[in-house]
């Protein structure tokens, strides 16, 4: 069944919650990769789905969407913390190439994910790293170009970088559940890495930002 086949008429994003996101997230992602790989109408179906959103659904989408330095993440749907579906709309090529953060950095993710190119192209490098400790070795593993219709499936430990994009590049992304509370960004210039923690991990230390010696700073 195409991923969006039942989503157009109902105005709801298709549910993928029956997949084994917790017990076998890689198998769940592999199944989604097959769905996306076989669905040549996904871009057109997605355009119809977005245009049919009711005001409340549109507001929910906007409230969950995120702006990054390299791209916009438009939230389409998901199920609790099992999976989430996004459209990544990349910034113009001239803007993207000036960034060395977010998608333009050498990094991995907290979760596995599957991505299909809806428009444009992405030029991607993959890397081998010795560890995600503060000091590590980083070496180029391979390079590839993803064009319209191509599907990419990455584990949470796969280290990669988007080197550049064409103008008007968009992808649909289905991400699985987080397998840890941080992703890692790597700097090839000095062999250093930096862990980027999620809000769940940072929350216990929140009060340290506005208290001192146990007293609230006024």
PLM regions and their residue ranges:
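A short, N-terminal "cap"/entry segment at the start of jelly-roll beta-barrel domains
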Residues: 1-89
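A short hydrophobic beta-strand segment most commonly corresponding to one strand
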Residues: 166-184
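Short, charged/polar surface micro-motifs in flexible loops or helix N-caps
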Residues: 81-83, 92-96, 121
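Short, conserved beta-strand element in jelly-roll/cupin
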Residues: 108-124
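Long hydrophobic alpha-helical segments typical of transmembrane helices together
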Residues: 190-218
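A short secondary-structure junction signal
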Residues: 86-88, 98-100, 125-137, 163-165, ...
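Short acidic-glycine-tyrosine-enriched beta hairpin
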Residues: 128-164
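Conserved short histidine dyad/triad with adjacent acidic residue
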Residues: 57, 87-109, 145, 155-157
């Amino acid at each position: 069944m195409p991923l969006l086949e039942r989503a157009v008429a109902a105005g709801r994003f298709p549910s993928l919650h029956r997949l084994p996101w917790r017990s076998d997230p890689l198998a769940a992602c592999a199944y989604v990769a097959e769905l996306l790989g076989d669905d040549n109408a996904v871009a057109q179906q997605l355009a119809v789905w977005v245009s049919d959103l009711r005001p409340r659904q549109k507001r929910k989408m906007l409230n969950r969407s995120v702006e990054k330095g390299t791209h916009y993440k438009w939230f389409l749907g998901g199920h609790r913390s099992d999976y989430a579906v996004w459209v990544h709309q990349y910034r113009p090529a001239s803007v993207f190439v000036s960034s060395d953060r977010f998608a333009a950095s050498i990094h991995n993710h907290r979760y596995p994910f599957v991505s299909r190119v809806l428009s444009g192209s992405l030029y991607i490098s993959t890397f081998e790293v010795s560890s995600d400790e503060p000091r590590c070795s980083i070496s180029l593993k391979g390079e590839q170009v993803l064009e319209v219709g191509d599907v990419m499936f990455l584990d949470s430990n796969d280290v990669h970088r988007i080197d550049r994009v064409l103008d008007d590049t968009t992808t649909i992304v289905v991400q699985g559940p987080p397998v840890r509370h941080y992703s890692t960004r790597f700097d090839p210039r000095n062999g250093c890495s930096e862990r980027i923690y999620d809000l769940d991990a940072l929350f216990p230390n929140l009060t340290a930002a506005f208290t001192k010696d146990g007293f609230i700073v006024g």
